[in-house]
Amino acid sequence: PMTLIFARDNSVAAIREALFARRSVAYSDNTLAGRKEYVEPLLRASVTAEKTGRTRKGKIEVALKNVSDIPYRFADPATNRLMVAAPLTTTYVWMDDAEMKHTWLVRNIYIRPDKHLEIQPLSLQR
């Protein structure tokens, strides 16, 4: 287990202030837990989504590139589809136009004990 603390500097006072202000994210067993304003930027710094083409059947090819060591697990509740952006790799997934607008759950990021981070795939584009 590890705690990421978002302090203004590395002084004891700044770290204490950040902890009391709850500017931290817990990390354990490839799972992040913290406030949305802290975990979402970590995901966005780690994973990008890019449309790379279309198949003959009209599906959109999307490259999920993960530059971190955390395997992010995405779920699309509308289709019961699971996707994993493996560490330090690019994962390709194929979706139709409607699926691109769905909201995904990030199964290994918690913003509350009972709630996963939600994100739209195209919002990960840079």
Q: What are these language model-derived features?
A:
Residues 1-126:
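Charged catalytic cores and adjacent phosphate/nucleic-acid-binding surfaces used
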